[in-house]
């Protein structure tokens, strides 16, 4: 029997970043079916879009995304993601992610299809691998996180099964 405050299943960017945030509030057990770097994040190339420098604005980024989405995007979700992106980029940097920089120390931003401004942060053409590397390093160092590699989540017994109050985060 194993008890934990937070159970994270999967070791991609979402699982690892959640584990790091949750570890500030309790013990985290992270379960992954293979090695931690065996995930889709590790293979992502391109980069991450974020309003970083003027003349870019949240409004321009939201507009570009909605235009490219051709009516298939939820405008509220687009606005939330665009406005939170700089904060989440700061988290990735704090956890050790190294994005490419220009000789003067500014982030080297790319511009790709559908974007009217340079707003794509990247690490060479291996952005996902760099993010995964930094997150894994931070997770392995954190005293409140236990990692179980080569494990499967099959039968989970929660407080709900015991007839007690359970919350979802």
What is each PLM-predicted segment?
Residues 2-4:
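Core beta-strand elements of the Rossmann-like FAD/NAD(P) dinucleotide-binding domain
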Residues 6-30:
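N-terminal Rossmann-like FAD-binding beta1-loop-alpha1 element of flavoenzymes
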Residues 32-169:
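Conserved N-terminal/central alpha/beta ligand/cofactor-binding core
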């Amino acid at each position: 029997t194993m008890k934990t405050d937070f159970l994270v299943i999967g070791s991609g960017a979402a699982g690892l970043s959640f584990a790091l945030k949750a570890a500030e509030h309790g013990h985290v057990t992270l379960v992954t079916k293979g090695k931690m770097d065996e995930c889709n994040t590790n293979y992502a190339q391109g980069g991450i879009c974020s309003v970083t420098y003027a003349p870019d604005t949240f409004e321009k980024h939201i507009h570009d995304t909605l235009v490219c989405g051709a009516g298939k995007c939820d405008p509220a979700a687009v606005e939330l993601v665009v406005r939170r992106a700089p904060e989440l980029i700061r988290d990735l940097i704090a956890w050790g992610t190294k994005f490419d920089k220009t000789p003067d120390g500014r982030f080297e931003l790319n511009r790709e299809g559908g974007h009217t401004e340079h707003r794509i942060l990247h690490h060479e053409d291996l952005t996902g691998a760099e993010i995964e590397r930094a997150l894994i390093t931070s997770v392995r160092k954190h005293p409140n996180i236990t990692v179980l590699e080569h494990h499967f989540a099959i039968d989970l017994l929660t407080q709900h099964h015991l007839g007690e109050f359970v919350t979802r985060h």
